[in-house]
């Protein structure tokens, strides 16, 4: 999913609500884990910067929650 589509489909309030639900129910870390796994196994291709950001975000979720 492209980030631009999120802004086109959902209001800022809806985006925040959805993000809070994902975080509160710990789905966010599962989604991050799955995305990173797909990248590492070659199922998905992303640039190095995006990969590093995903790993950093994953680590923050693991250690801060």
UniProtKB/Swiss-Prot annotation:
<dbReference type="InterPro" id="IPR025446">
    <property type="entry name" value="Antirep_AbbA"/>
</dbReference>
<dbReference type="Pfam" id="PF14156">
    <property type="entry name" value="AbbA_antirepres"/>
</dbReference>
<protein>
    <recommendedName>
        <fullName>Uncharacterized protein YkzF</fullName>
    </recommendedName>
</protein>
């Amino acid at each position: 999913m492209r980030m631009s589509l999120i802004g086109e489909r959902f209001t800022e309030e809806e985006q925040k609500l959805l993000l809070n639900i994902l975080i509160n129910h710990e789905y966010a870390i599962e989604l991050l884990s799955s995305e990173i796994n797909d990248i590492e196994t070659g199922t998905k291709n992303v640039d190095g910067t995006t990969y590093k950001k995903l790993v950093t975000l994953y680590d923050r979720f693991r250690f801060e929650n």
